[in-house]
Amino acid sequence: MKKVLITGGSGLLGQYINLIAPKRLSIVTTFRNNPGNCKEFPSSKIDILNANQLENIIQNVKPAVVIHTAAVTNPIPKKNQPPKEYFNTNVTATKNIAELCAQYNSKLVYVSTDLVYAGYRGSFLKEDAKLIPATLYAETKLIGEQKVKEFTDNYLIIRTALLYGIGLNHSRCHFQDMLNNLRNKRPVKLFVDQFRTPISLTDASEIIVNLASTDHKGEILNLGGVERISRSDLGEILCSLGGFDKNLLQKITMDDIPNFPKVEDVSLNIEKLQALGFKPRTIQENISEILATNSRI
């Protein structure tokens, strides 16, 4: 089997990739602080901001593929969080990884975001749609994409849509908090005016691993679900399938949140992905599975 090195292995998406990748690939996964499920696999604690540590692990592992998920992902910086944290991780470390992948002949699978697109150019955006990131997070992810293309030819850039599911160990996501609140009969505020094409953590990680195991390269791919919906719509589906009280859903607009970056529609066209044979499941199918396998959060 091909050997793969995973960055951000203790993150929300990384832990799912850890679970799925061994079916197809020989993995070494990495973490910086909390290991999450990395301890269950061949793993190493590294700081991707340390160029020497990065080179040492790539030199020692000699991966055929590097799946780069590590990132600073907060859409809005936390209080007193300096912008340089975004640039150091999302740009500089990504550039270093791309250079090392070129040096050691490793394919780089770079996980980016749907938020690099302009949020006012229509629905079901193709990969060549206009790019106007509205947040520091999205801006640095886009610069990261540019660094990948600048320093290596053997790459795949995967722009992921909103991820939903149940975070493993210490990781969490908005969907998980929504489910927990509804189960405990607590109200949930949800946007009615932001549209995306959500994809489950399970489907996203399966597709990323499958793409990593192929020789496909030199391309940008949208990775999302087939349905364009708002977070409010997602909450409605969850209530219907889980038997929760829809009156707990409090519909709000982005204008209701001071200083919130207004990204109205970054729903993704996934025809290129589908042409490669990938077919994400519907939201109803995924949520039904989540409810069946996670009776308690």
Where are these regions (language model features)?
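NAD(P)-dependent short-chain dehydrogenase/reductase
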Residues: 146-196, 210
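Catalytic helix-loop patch of NAD(P)-dependent Rossmann-fold dehydrogenases
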Residues: 84, 88, 92-96, 116-158, ...
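SDR active-site strand-loop-helix element
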Residues: 7, 30, 66-70, 108-114, ...
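N-terminal Rossmann NAD(P)H-binding glycine-rich loop of SDR-like oxidoreductase domains
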Residues: 2-24
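NAD(P)H-binding glycine-rich loop region in Rossmannoid oxidoreductase-like domains
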Residues: 48-89, 100
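Mid/C-terminal beta-alpha module of Rossmann-like enzyme folds, strongest
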Residues: 207, 214-258
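Rossmann-fold cofactor-recognition segment
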Residues: 38-50
